[in-house]
Amino acid sequence: AIPDDIIKKREKKQSRDKKEADIASSAGEADADSADEPKKAKTASKASKAAKSKKIKKQLEGIELAAQMVKNILKSGLATMGAGGVKTYEQLSKQLGDYYLSGMQHLVNELIIEMKAFDVDGKDEHYDAAAVKLERLWTLIKKSREYLTAKLESDDTQLDDTQLYEQLGGVWKLEELRALGLCRSNAELLQLSFDVSYDDAGKQYIDEGCYIDLGSGELVCTYNYRPVKALKYIRQDDSVFHVTQVGELAMYPGQGNKRVRWNGSTTRAVTKEDIDKVRSFAADYLSDEVKKAKNILKNALAPEIYYTLIRYERIGECGERLALLDKTGASIMLGLSLIHI
């Protein structure tokens, strides 16, 4: 018979060997999982890239539909959009939404609204406005077609620092703006103006605030979009009479007065030093600011308004209107686009 002490030693050894085997097995499984992680990430990345490429191809298809529409209008004339012809364009507008082109869809809606109004009252202002919308639409078609085609050919589906993404209908996420280096820390903003308007083409209210960055003197804007269907879910912005202190300020791609946003802020009272600082950022010469505005606004895709600060010598009446004069005597009609240099 085998002695009891030998049997106990064997049992202990078998138990120890089993534990070591279990540990080795667990380690092997962990290593296998770790090795699979890059594969899983790579697979997810490929799937995401494929989805983005598919979306770009879909957008390009929609762009060609819009391009054909513009060509038809240019061939037959804007007036053909009125009366019975408008239904065709309304149908096209709905289609553009299916091609991830909500920005282009919005422009088509603006065009339709102006031509409907022209068909009713025959006022030239509607026809002229429609012509501007048509030019803006055609510019967006050409630039976005070129941009998206280049993305496909280079196999690059990453987001870029370009305003085209938003103008086509994309919605920027804060982390995306941060990844592009479009965020800066510790900004102080003072609101200079606030306005609420109704966007008939988008069936939404837009709260717009114009702010000055007290650190740089740059004029920036906030936009809060409130669709009519979701008014009870989206809080309306309001006038701000204090200095807004922002830990991280995100700036959207674009020209002129860039759009900004932030998550979380604190406030402090406005001081005399703040007002003096705002005044120090004002331009001395109207002619210089007019040149800047013209260079920005000549781009058909630029915002329709450009904000700037001008130090004036005098503001007085000119007929039934007001005019601003700088220290050189150069003037501009306030509230109008009539410039006298």
Give the role of each language-model region.
Residues 1:
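Active-site-proximal cofactor/substrate-binding loop regions of enzyme domains
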Residues 12-168:
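Extended alpha-helical scaffolds
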Residues 161-334:
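Extended, amphipathic alpha-helical scaffolds
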Residues 339-341:
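Conserved small/polar residues in nucleotide/adenosyl-binding loops
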